[in-house]
Amino acid sequence: MRSPVCCASLVLLLLPGVPSASAMAQTEVAIGGVKLDSELGVPGVLGDVDDGLEESADGRSDSKRRSWESVVAPIPSRNPAFGWMLSVPVMLMYKPSFAGPEDPVWISGLFGFYAENESWGAGLLQRMSFGGDRWRVTGALFRAEMNYEYFGIGGGGGASIVLDQDADLALVEGLRRVAPNLYLGLQAMYARTELGPQLPDVDLPPGLDPDRLRVDLTLATIAPRLQYDTRDNEFYPRSGLLVNASAAVSRDSIGADLDYERYKASMNHYLAVGNQGVLASRIVTQYTSDGTPFFLFPAFGQGADLRGYQMGSYRDRFLVAVQSEYRHRFTKRIGAAAFGGVGSVAPDFGGWEKSLWSAGAGFRFVLAPKNDISLRVDVARGRDETVYYVGVGEAF
């Protein structure tokens, strides 16, 4: 799994309520608010980890006979959108007997979460690689019932209404290496979703018609995908570049109720600073065409871009964000990070009226020294509020 997930990145775009995550296997999909990264964690800290190491007849572990590794990591957290919540990723990492030395491990994952406001979700993930990592295949199934606040389009007004949204989603992606470090492929998504408002006794956001929020939709998209990856480590890169681009198309000819397009491009850059530091930078832009349902509009607060915003408090057809994060290891286990960024949302390319900013810092504890996977605790201040984050793996 390429930089497996905080499940920014499934960020289940269907469900704006799902907290931030990075891209599961870089499919730009998210399942919940915790990365499903795993490998040789610390038993008793975030759950029990089994390295699947078999012993030889003389009682010594033989690294050549390693068959599988697993992790279970229950993580409590709290955010403005859901209140207290518990996320539990369960991951199994293994190499089939026919896998070659260049093939990454296969990953089977199960993820679930439950929140104080009675939101819940559960998902399955399977990631496979074939032919010396020439082919990468990812599949996911997800079911969720979410309660979250809708602030209208644009954002910053403060008023909101609570929406109930149920969704079932299936996703499959196939990528093929066509040049060194360059992959091309397709991602297909099919989902059913029902959504309706819990109308409060308060003034509604300007221009908001509650009847427009009651929907029962079938969603289906086909998305050409590009990925360019020169990172030296998929879990904690110290150098290299990661570029992702996709163009999702929805048409009735493939079973969708709506016709629209969604475009997204992102670039992460990593630079080693001395022996203990890393400067990570990221730029992302997203665009949605006419006909896109509001819950698929780009928004801050549902991914790793511009931490410090409640989910969906700023959403519109265009989004752009730039951020940098300095990561430092004080010891083999203990580290910290400081980050900041700027961004905005707008109805069109020339409509950038309000600049948004974000700044924060966090603590890191390395759970898996072999692959540099850390427990991440961040506090971020945005334009309007302060938000706390707990997860496994780096934000991007």
PLM segments and residue spans:
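Bacterial N-terminal signal peptides
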Residues: C7-V18
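Hydrophobic, lipid-facing positions within transmembrane beta-strands of outer-membrane proteins
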Residues: S70-V72, L86-V88, W120-L124, D168-V172, ...
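Positively charged n-region of N-terminal signal peptides that target proteins for export
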Residues: M1-P4
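Predominantly the C-terminal beta-signal and adjacent terminal strand-loop region
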Residues: L226, I283, G350-L356, V366-F396
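N-terminal periplasmic/intermembrane-space "pro-region" immediately following the signal or transit peptide
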Residues: A23-A73, S77
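C-terminal outer-membrane beta-barrel translocator/porin domains of Gram-negative envelope proteins
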Residues: D48, G52, G59, P210-R212, ...
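Gram-negative/organellar outer-membrane beta-barrel architecture
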Residues: S61-V72, P76-T218, I373-S374, A380-F396
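Membrane-embedded beta-strand positions of outer-membrane beta-barrel proteins
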Residues: V72-P74, V90, S108-G112, V137-L141, ...
